[in-house]
Curated annotation (Swiss-Prot):
Protein name: Septation ring formation regulator EzrA
Membrane topology per record: Single-pass membrane protein
Coiled coil stretches, renumbered: 110-191, 265-301, 354-416, 456-526
Pfam families: EzrA (PF06160)
Domain of life: Bacteria
Functional note: Negative regulator of FtsZ ring formation; modulates the frequency and position of FtsZ ring formation. Inhibits FtsZ ring formation at polar sites. Interacts either with FtsZ or with one of its binding partners to promote depolymerization.
GO cellular component terms listed in the entry, alphabetical order: plasma membrane; septin ring
Source organism (scientific name): Streptococcus pneumoniae (strain ATCC 700669 / Spain 23F-1)
Keyword annotations of the record: Cell cycle, Cell division, Cell membrane, Coiled coil, Membrane, Septation, Transmembrane, Transmembrane helix
Xref: HAMAP family: EzrA
Compartmental location: Cell membrane
Chief location of this protein within or outside the cell: membrane
NCBIfam families: PRK04778.1-4
Amino acid sequence: MSNGQLIYLMVAIAVILVLAYVVAIFLRKRNEGRLEALEERKEELYNLPVNDEVEAVKNMHLIGQSQVAFREWNQKWVDLSLNSFADIENNLFEAEGYNHSFRFLKASHQIDQIESQITLIDEDIAAIRNALADLEKQESKNSGRVLHALDLFEELQHRVAENSEQYGQALDEIEKQLENIQSEFSQFVTLNSSGDPVEAAVILDNTENHILALSHIVDRVPALVTTLSTELPDQLQDLESGYRKLIDANYHFVETDIEARFHLLYEAFKKNQENIRQLELDNAEYENGQAQEEINALYDIFTREIAAQKVVENLLATLPTYLQHMKENNTLLGEDIARLNKTYLLPETAASHVRRIQTELESFEAAIVEVTSNQEEPTQAYSVLEENLEDLQTQLKDIEDEQISVSERLTQIEKDDINARQKANVYVNRLHTIKRYMEKRNLPGIPQTFLKLFFTASNNTEDLMVELEQKMINIESVTRVLEIATNDMEALETETYNIVQYATLTEQLLQYSNRYRSFDERIQEAFNEALDIFEKEFDYHASFDKISQALEVAEPGVTNRFVTSYEKTRETIRF
């Protein structure tokens, strides 16, 4: 190793030693500062006037729970002052030794433990001092609270005494609880003045709770007593009185246990008085509600029968008239059927329908007569009679609807006859008009499609007239043939217009094609074919298609122009 390298090594070692010394001095100073701060905190805690506070509470000569609480907190202070502070002192001395011997990690760990110990002692001392302060102040605090409680109690006593009649069976139990609260006040005074304010505070808490609970009871009882002793019995008496009057007026009821339900309600009132007496107010309120529901149910029964009686009277007054009206309608229907049977073949269902209705009306009449005859001495509840009579009314309404339906069908027969005769005459005239209309067109011939439709329509119109001339007209057959003839006439009219339209347009297009025939062989050829179809086959639609297709090639849109012009000036068939 060269001299230069040796010098560098020695310098590096010297620098490291200097740095190590500086670090050691820094750590030692820092630990010393922390130890001094902990020593100051320990002294501050130790010098707190806890002993004086303990002596002050001890001189109060506490007893009972207060004395037990004091002893516990005093013992805790003794343990802290004798043991915990000594442990901290030893740990401080040990940490200083570690720090002076440059064992900085152990010193730092020891300092951390001391900080935790001092923090715990600080919290314990604070708890001890707060507890001692509470014990010292408890008596005066109790004195302030008891005045408020006494005011509430005296107000409660005064309210009960002035309104004793409102509490009914509950009065004895309320007064008993007032006496118990009075005893609790006496017990509180004894404990608070004899050196046990903690136990006295517990007694005062209970007393305040009892006062509040009893106040709540006193608030609720009058309404419950009024309901149970006055309102519900009055309602029940009114119900009983009303029930007797209804019975005297020959009312009957579906329910057969009404008397028993009255008795059960009176028994329920008596039993619920016991709930009031024992201050079981929730039960009393529930039972009152149940009784009210039962009374309402009975009231609904009576009002139902009273309302039903009025409905029954109205139905008994109107149903006979309604029934008589329907019998008259049925007689008229029978007369209509007899009259129509002289001219028309009516289905047997019409007559049998009227006969069935007549039978049903007779049975309904017997039922109405029976109910009416029993009204002087009714044997059923009016609600039952109401249901039966309303059912009878509904059935009569259904029968009336049937009568209306039959009447409409009978009336429609004559209307259909008149309509068919009018249509037959119209169709005969239309056939003649269409024939003349076609003849005036001077067509080279009539297409077979037209002739077939014309003769079919003519034959069906003739069939319709034959049906109408029968001695006994079958209106169903007439209606069927009329529908066929109507469809034929519509088809014939449509075909007539089509034939005339295509024939006329074909003639116009053939004439218009003359301007192209001299130089357009294709149009000349189409002209010849279209003319041949027109004059020999009489298929005017095909002839129109042939010439129009050729002209469209030479002059697009020409066909539409002719069609539009024709539709504006087309001659209609004048029927």
